[in-house]
Amino acid sequence: GWMLFTALRAGIDIRTDCPTVDLVVEEGKVTGVIARQGGKEVRIGATKGVLLNAGGFARNAEMRKQFGPQPSFTEWTVANPGDTGEMLQTVMKLGAATHGLDRAIWTIASRQPNGNLGIHANELAKPHLIVVDKHGKRFTNESCSYMETGQNIYKAGAVPCWAIMDSRHRAKYAWALTPPRYTPAEWITSG
């Protein structure tokens, strides 16, 4: 959006399909990056600093185990395939301060019978549905934000948990990519 527009207007060099491989450090300061461009490693210098938009580590099992609540598996994420944390690890080795590594965007997902993940950003807040733990106990307010719901799942030790919905919910609301008024037979047979 605006950041790209402003950068282009200012004549800043924008490179796509050019992942950062490493940082160039001179006298304790980051002065550029080593990037892969066109199959070759190239050095790109910086005169005023390096701005990193490194993403997270949703697809890095070791970092999930080190920093996040458990249980946690990379198979549970729909984050982009490049969300692996290498650049974060690189800057941490240089002594960069970090904060909030135990946090995540807790978008609620369910495993579909075909193995795919269904994403549920807003479905839990709809009427005629509750979320329960393995004992059938309700442990969260389904109308809270998906971030709070994710935190509540871990606070309650409710991994895994289940969404229980009645026919009124199915008649009015989608569930992931499944439209209302249609409940696949395999949902019933698979539990």
Pin down the residues of each PLM region:
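Conserved N-terminal/central alpha/beta ligand/cofactor-binding core
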Residues: G1-D13, V131, R138, W175
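Glycine-rich loop(s) and the adjacent beta-strand/alpha-helix scaffold that form part
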Residues: R9, Q37-N114, G118
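A conserved short coil-to-beta-strand element within the FAD-binding core of flavoproteins
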Residues: T16-V30
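Short, glycine-/Ser/Thr-/acidic-enriched flexible segments
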Residues: V21, G38-K40, G49, G56-A58, ...
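Short, acidic, Ser/Thr-enriched surface-loop or helix-capping motifs
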Residues: V25, R36, D133
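Short capping micro-motif at the N-terminus of alpha-helices
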Residues: V33, I44-A46, T140-E142
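An anion/pyrophosphate-binding glycine-rich loop and adjacent beta-alpha core
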Residues: L88-T90, A97-G191
